[in-house]
């Protein structure tokens, strides 16, 4: 497997830290040892996050093609679009963002705070579109690309989550390689990795990266799309494409893609009581914030797996914190009392 042959444009600080979650582990009985890898602290570009790691492999292609405008898509409180806007500003490029109405939620300031506020401050051309949630290619995004061409620009297309893109899985192959190097320093290997999944390339890259040492099925995706069949298909497809691209010396099988469907409800972007309890518990035991759309759901999943005895006693579990905290501001009413 060879990731080094792909050009990478540095946008992150370097390897992200691994932090023991000692108080949360103790609160949950102390039989499972929890850790977090802090992708939410990976960059100085507008709070960073998992998409910034992915963009390191997309940006060299955009520059090589002479593109002048990054064009991406997400929901109103999209972390993806905020990170694309930050990278565009950092590189001196233009940025067009399609922000669809992916979440059935109304807060008085939902479309004026958090991620979308930062994207506007960063200078992006933010275009609100009423279309609902879907992780596939969108007509609104195609229209935005065409509008840039019609104005004489040269757009670079970045799909939702950087996912359905030939290079979208590479960043998290690198994540797995980074974890292996950190494990060598720590003196132990993690038994499981827990990660939130929606558009698929984060988990897909991890599956490929950890397949190299036989741990593909130890990556536990926690679905937050509430459309798990579509998410599972996309993870599997991206993983297979990425495996071929990096020269993994085995096929990706369906059994390699583990996706837990229990924690996504009631629907994309809306937390349930378990999500909210997990957000508060993590914050109050570790001082680590998670959001209601993504990380709160994967945190809920990990907590319940520990409570239910789904990890063998003594397991070391690595929680991949992908970012997303700026979206908390869009849910101010839910958290009005903390």
UniProtKB/Swiss-Prot annotation:
Please give the residue positions where the record annotates the modification N6-(pyridoxal phosphate)lysine: 51
In Swiss-Prot or TrEMBL terms, this protein is called: 1-aminocyclopropane-1-carboxylate deaminase
GO BP term, example: 1-aminocyclopropane-1-carboxylate metabolic process
Which EC class is the enzyme in? Answer: hydrolase
Active site at 78
Which protein family is named in the record?
A: Belongs to the ACC deaminase/D-cysteine desulfhydrase family.
Molecular function GO labels: 1-aminocyclopropane-1-carboxylate deaminase activity; D-cysteine desulfhydrase activity; pyridoxal phosphate binding
Alphabetical list of PANTHER family matching this protein: 1-AMINOCYCLOPROPANE-1-CARBOXYLATE DEAMINASE-RELATED
Alphabetical UniProt keywords: Hydrolase, Pyridoxal phosphate
Q: Which cofactor does it need?
A: pyridoxal 5'-phosphate
Q: Describe the task this protein carries out.
A: Catalyzes a cyclopropane ring-opening reaction, the irreversible conversion of 1-aminocyclopropane-1-carboxylate (ACC) to ammonia and alpha-ketobutyrate. Allows growth on ACC as a nitrogen source.
EC number per UniProt: 3.5.99.7
The UniProt entry's coiled-coil ranges are none
The record describes its quaternary structure and partners as: Homotrimer.
- What HAMAP family does UniProt report for this protein, alphabetically? ACC_deaminase (MF_00807)
Species this chain originates from: Pseudomonas sp. (strain ACP)
- Output the InterPro entries linked to this UniProt entry: ACCD_DCysDesulf, ACP_carboxylate_deaminase, ACP_carboxylate_deaminase_bac, TrpB-like_PALP, TrpB-like_PALP_sf
> Which reaction(s) does its UniProt entry say it catalyses?
1-aminocyclopropane-1-carboxylate + H2O = 2-oxobutanoate + NH4(+)
Q: Which domain of life is it from?
A: Bacteria
Q: Name one Pfam family in it.
A: PALP
């Amino acid at each position: 497997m060879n990731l080094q042959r792909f050009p990478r444009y540095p946008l992150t600080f370097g390897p992200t830290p691994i932090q023991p979650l000692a108080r949360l582990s103790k609160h949950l009985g102390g039989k499972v040892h929890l850790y977090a890898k802090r992708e939410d602290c990976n960059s100085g570009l507008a709070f960073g996050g998992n998409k910034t790691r992915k963009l390191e492999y997309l940006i060299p292609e955009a520059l090589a093609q002479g593109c002048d405008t990054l064009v991406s898509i997400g929901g109103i409180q999209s972390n993806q679009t905020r990170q694309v806007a930050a990278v565009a500003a950092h590189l001196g490029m233009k940025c067009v963002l399609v922000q669809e109405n992916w979440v059935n939620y109304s807060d008085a300031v939902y479309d004026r705070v958090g991620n979308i506020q930062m994207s506007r401050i960063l200078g992006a051309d933010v275009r609100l579109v009423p279309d609902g949630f879907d992780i596939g290619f969108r007509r609104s995004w195609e229209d935005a690309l065409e509008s840039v061409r019609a104005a004489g620009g040269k757009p670079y297309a970045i799909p939702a989550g950087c996912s359905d893109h030939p290079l979208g899985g590479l960043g998290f192959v690198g994540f797995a390689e980074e974890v292996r190097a950190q494990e060598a320093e720590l003196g132990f290997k993690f038994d499981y990795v827990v990660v939130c999944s929606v558009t698929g390339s984060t988990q897909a890259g991890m599956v490929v990266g950890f397949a190299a040492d036989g741990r593909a099925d130890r990556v536990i995706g926690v679905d937050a799309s509430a459309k798990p069949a579509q998410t599972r298909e996309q993870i599997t497809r991206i993983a297979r494409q990425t495996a071929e691209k990096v020269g993994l010396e085995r096929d990706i099988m369906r059994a390699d893609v583990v996706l837990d469907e229990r924690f996504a409800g009631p629907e994309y972007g809306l937390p349930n009581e378990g999500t909210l309890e997990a957000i508060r518990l993590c914050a109050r035991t570790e001082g680590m914030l998670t959001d209601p759309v993504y990380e709160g759901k994967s945190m809920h999943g990990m907590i319940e797996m520990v409570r239910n005895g789904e990890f063998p006693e003594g397991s070391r579990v690595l929680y991949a914190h992908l970012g997303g905290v700026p979206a908390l501001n869009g849910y101010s009413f839910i958290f009005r009392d903390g």
